[in-house]
């Protein structure tokens, strides 16, 4: 459909200009509570989501994007990972870790997020396995360019598009994170079943944090 009335729409490439992107609308269906008439059209449903998204992205945010030489799709893609990986209290910290990995001089230029990866064993919240694979009728049927563009363990930088529809807190954190000291220079994070986040700058520190998280998880599972 034609949604050119919304400012953000002009910043989102058409399918022909983004051949590796899975879905154009992904990321822009703003999460909110809505009321619809049951006989309304799909176009009007989508337009309502888009209008709400459009209202969130202010002129100041567009100016900040320009200042950072960042596109709106890049921001929303980053924010979608923040949305999936962090609770609100950790949005800025997780966003900073991802931005550290995306920096030009990063020693770890891949997001390596299990929320969009080839790793089937971690498929509870995995975009490639839960959404893309069913659409194509199974993993083996996914076009190779799509897998390459969304598997964050193989593609450098951001994937070809968002993996969810982030809320405004995740979007703001992705645009201008305010991390704590622990996360400021970190390249890694891991969580435990109690919801604690552990941040690390080096792989050895991260491996130690993984062991700490595993011990917590073992205790939690024992208490069940």
Give the residues covered by each predicted segment.
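Bacterial extracytoplasmic/cell-wall-associated proteins, especially those involved in peptidoglycan
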Residues: 2-224
């Amino acid at each position: 459909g034609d949604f050119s009335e919304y400012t953000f729409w002009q910043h989102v490439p058409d399918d022909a200009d983004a051949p590796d992107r899975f879905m154009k609308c992904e990321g822009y269906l703003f999460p909110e509570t809505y009321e619809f008439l049951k006989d309304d059209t799909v176009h009007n449903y989508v337009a309502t989501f888009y209008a709400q998204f459009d209202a969130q992205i202010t002129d100041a945010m567009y100016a900040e994007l320009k200042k950072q030489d960042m596109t709106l799709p890049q921001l929303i893609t980053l924010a979608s990972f923040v949305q999936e990986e962090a609770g609100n209290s950790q949005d800025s910290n997780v966003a900073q870790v991802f931005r550290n990995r995306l920096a030009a001089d990063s020693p770890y230029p891949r997001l390596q997020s299990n929320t969009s990866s080839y790793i089937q064993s971690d498929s509870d919240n995995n975009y490639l396995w839960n959404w893309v694979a069913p659409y194509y009728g199974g993993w083996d049927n996914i076009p190779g360019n799509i897998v390459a563009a969304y598997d964050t363990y193989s593609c450098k930088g951001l994937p070809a598009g968002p993996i969810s529809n982030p809320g405004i807190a995740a979007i703001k954190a992705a645009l201008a994170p305010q991390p704590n000291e622990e996360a400021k220079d970190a390249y890694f994070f891991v969580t435990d079943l109690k919801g604690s986040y552990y941040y690390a700058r080096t792989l050895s520190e991260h491996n130690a944090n993984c062991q700490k998280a595993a011990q917590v998880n073992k205790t939690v599972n024992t208490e069940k």
